[in-house]
Design a protein with these regions (language model features):
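An N-terminally biased module of ancient metal coordination in phosphate/nucleic-acid-related enzymes
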Residues: 1-73, 157-158, 171, 177-218
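Short, glycine/charge-rich beta-strand/loop segments that flank catalytic centers
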Residues: 63-66, 121-127
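Generic hydrophobic/packing signal
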Residues: 64, 81-83, 115
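Active-site gating loops and adjacent loop-to-helix segments of metal-dependent hydrolytic enzymes
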Residues: 69-101, 119, 138-161
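Short, well-structured alpha-helical patches and their helix-loop capping segments
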Residues: 92-103, 124-132
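Conserved phosphoryl-transfer catalytic core
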Residues: 98-123
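Conserved acidic, metal-coordinating active-site core of Asp-based
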Residues: 127-191
């Protein structure tokens, strides 16, 4: 039998809209046999997802989407099939959590100055884990500042906009080395979504390969 895979999905543990349990149920409805939960810089949703996956006969692979900086750009590296309790992985994700929280607070301050009241508190109320820009976007929609998430990024949260805050994420080699140390494989996430020219994408792929990366999403 041909298996159906989904190796990159998010839950409410980061910026997804479904809980880990509901996400696995949705995957089952869609006929997915092998699923990887790859929340941003966290693995807190995996245990919950695993319980439901076992009930429904879905193979759940440990996953995470690690935020990195490369040449001044934010690049996401997916880790798959790793030991989520490995000391290097837990240390890296703890560092990322601290960086993400610091950025979230700074974004909240900028939104306050831009006339958005209680921005951090509002976004946090919508989050099940770390506060992300997606939660701020949803809050902006909720209070009527914008009509949809996309408009929130275009007006406030996207790169170069008034409330954008650049995070000092780890570099790509650190992400790759950590994933490998934990027994997993490292993959460039959505390479065509970084608004880069073909020349820059090729540079990214070459660097990633030289640093020991294993593959990329297509």
């Amino acid at each position: 039998m041909t298996k159906k895979y989904d190796l990159h999905c998010h839950s409410t543990a980061s910026d997804g809209v479904l809980t880990p349990t509901a996400l696995v149920q949705r995957a089952h409805e869609q006929g997915i046999n092998v699923l990887a939960l790859c929340d941003h810089d966290t693995v807190i949703g995996i245990d919950e997802a695993k319980l439901e996956a076992d009930k429904l006969g879905i193979e759940l692979i440990n996953g995470v989407e690690i935020s990195t900086n490369w040449e001044g750009r934010g690049i996401h590296i997916v880790g798959l099939n790793f030991d989520k309790t490995h000391p290097k992985m837990t240390a890296l994700l703890a560092e990322q959590k601290s960086l993400r929280e610091k950025r979230a607070v700074e974004i909240g301050h900028k939104l306050e100055k831009a006339g958005v009241p209680n921005a951090y508190e509002g976004a946090k109320a919508l989050a099940n884990g770390e506060v992300t820009r997606a939660h701020y976007a949803r809050y902006l929609v909720q209070i009527g500042k914008v009509s949809n998430d996309g408009q929130a990024f275009k007006r406030y949260l996207g790169g170069g906009k008034s409330c954008f805050v650049k995070a000092e994420w780890v570099d790509i080699p650190t992400a790759i080395d950590t994933i490998h140390a934990a027994g997993g494989v490292a993959v460039i996430a959505h390479p065509m979504r970084y608004n880069m020219t073909g020349k820059w994408i090729r540079r990214l792929i070459v660097d990633f390969k030289q640093w020991g990366g294993d593959g990329m999403e297509v």
